[in-house]
Every structure is written in C-alpha cells, then in structure tokens.
C-alpha cells in the first residue's frame, strides 16, 4: 500500500532537536516558544538515530507539554491530514488531533515489551530506559493541554506479541 504516514512523535523530537542545537533551555517554556517560527517542516532532515536518542526523547516529552508547541504541531498534523489523508500515529491523535476520524486504533504494549523494544532501538541503559518510559507516560497523562488518554471509541490492540512489520 502507498498510504501517507505521519509519526507525530517524530515532529516533537525534531523540534526538540532544533531547540537543543540552538542551546535553548527546554525547561524554559518562553525560550522554547521563540524557536517555533523556525520549525516549518514536518520532518527536517535529521537522522533517525538522532531523533530516537534518549536525550531527544526526554526533551521532546518536556517540550510537548507546552501549549504553543502543541498548537503548532497539531496545526501541522491537521494540515497533513487534510492534504494527504492516510495514517497518523501519535499519543493524542484520536482524542485531540483528529477526534472525528471514523477509524481509531489504540496500540499498546506491556511495559517490559516497550522497554525491550526501546532498548533494541537505541542500545541504552535498560534501567534508565524503563524510568524514562515511566516518566514520559506520567508527563503525558498529567499535561494540562491534550493529556494522554484512551478514546473509548478506539479499538484497543495489544501489540506486545507483534513485531514491527505486523
């Protein structure tokens, strides 16, 4: 199939990378907001190795809490959906970005499987990866703007026993 696909998490990671390259303190919301006008593409040319790094993941989780950052990303995501249709993957895609979409799926996996997958992806410290995943989930559930939640309309799919291709 040749279906357009957008990984919204990579957008936050790419913006996080941009902030870090400009030596922006990601814990300072106003400083992060100043960089937003420079982020005009959904995916700048950044290697996946960099985007998938622990540092970028941690900082992306922090900046994704900021309302103006989310507003900008959601606007780009909705534009993508309107222009291209297709599959959009992300933590608040079915509850906030495209709540009216008729096809909603909620993929999840057991914690140890998520840690194992992440470990295989970045070859980092197992314990640190587990803590990072827990902290990110907590931040995403507790953020004020578009918190992570399960849409009762989505079809839940446990991906614990599935491989990446499946």
Question: For each predicted feature, which ranges?
Answer:
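A conserved segment at the C-terminal end of the G1
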Residues: 1-3
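Glycine-rich phosphate-binding loops of nucleotide-dependent enzymes
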Residues: 66, 104-107, 111-115, 121-122, ...
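Phosphate-binding beta-loop-alpha motif at adenosine-nucleotide cofactor sites
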Residues: 102, 148-165
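Short, flexible helix/strand-to-coil boundary loops that buttress conserved ligand/catalytic motifs
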Residues: 91, 118-119
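Glycine/charge-rich, flexible interdomain linkers and switch-proximal surface loops
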Residues: 88-96, 146-154
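ATP-dependent small-molecule kinase phosphotransfer cores
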Residues: 11-86, 97, 112, 116, ...
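Metal-dependent nucleotidyltransferase catalytic core
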Residues: 121, 125-129
